Amino acid sequence: MSLKKKKILDEIIRVNHAGEFGAQQIYAGQIKFTKEPELKKTLNKIAEEEDEHLSYFEDLMIEKRVRPTLMSPLWKLGGFSLGAFTAILGKDYVMACTEAVETIIVDHYKSQIGQIEEIEIQKKIEKFLNDEAGHQLTGMNQIKNNDFKLKVFKKFIKIITKIAIKVSQKI
């Protein structure tokens, strides 16, 4: 593998690990602070899939000798806080957050597939992309009042997610 291709693969592994770590933190905050039993059940199911994704990228980081992002402490605090905040605001904000983050992640994973030469990694990312698309649909389908405030909130979350992706690739 050329140095350029190794650098690209390292960035993909690092950013995907960071994203799954951040998602895990968001769901942990939401699960801890939500008061709705059915919502908590849905979030636990999603969190289980995110745990599988995170575990895969943790193992891959060790195998490929890729360092994690230096932003992990910030992503831990920020993700958990975002999760707690949305849970306090209620189900629509929890689901809007899920929809917004997963919309960006689906596009992000799609953009990576053609850059990866290793078939096993490519297939895992395709599987995770399908999982994330399912989370995105769950979010979209469970929002009851998609008003102006919620639309602005989703736009804000999408911007933050894109920034986190760019930063995590490099730092």
Task: Give the role of each language-model region.
Residues 1-171:
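Non-heme di-metal
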